[in-house]
């Protein structure tokens, strides 16, 4: 059942060393799910994975939260992964620097860069365009939002 929840049922009998990094992470998450937790804490679950593996893990985690109602605490340095969160907490040296929705946090491009974090590319581009005089909303954080704003 847990393997099915993370899309790994077809690999139940595969040797673990033949799985990709993303598949191994999904199997590890399935192991956690078998315990039926109310909350899962994932610390850098996509570290050392290729972009496809990262997408697989983010998709799996979103599904666990939305479909199974499991609370996810997701620690990452990849700001594009944090876009999928309901709430983002930015910490610096063990202290909360700021928190809010992804729009509230990632619209603070300059503040993020000051503490060594990169905002999503769309937020950075929108910020630079605003600095050059182009009128754009301050809460643009995704590629789709940026494209839509530029086409108006």
What function would you assign to each model-found segment?
Residues 40-43:
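Catalytic Walker B motif of ABC-type/P-loop ATPase nucleotide-binding domains
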Residues 15-19, 23:
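Conserved ABC ATPase signature
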């Amino acid at each position: 059942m847990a393997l099915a929840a993370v899309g790994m049922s077809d690999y139940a009998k595969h040797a673990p060393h033949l799985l990709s990094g993303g598949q191994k992470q999904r199997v590890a998450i399935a192991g956690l799910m078998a315990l039926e937790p109310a909350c899962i804490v994932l610390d850098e679950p996509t570290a050392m994975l290729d972009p496809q593996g990262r997408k697989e893990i983010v998709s799996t985690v979103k599904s666990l939260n939305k479909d199974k109602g499991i609370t996810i605490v997701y620690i990452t340095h990849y700001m594009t992964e944090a876009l999928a969160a309901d709430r983002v907490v930015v910490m610096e040296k063990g202290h909360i620097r700021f928190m809010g929705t992804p729009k509230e946090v990632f619209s603070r491009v300059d503040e993020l860069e000051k503490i060594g974090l990169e905002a999503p590319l769309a937020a950075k581009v929108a910020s630079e365009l605003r600095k050059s005089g182009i009128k754009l909303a301050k809460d643009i954080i995704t590629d789709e939002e940026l494209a839509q704003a530029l086409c108006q």
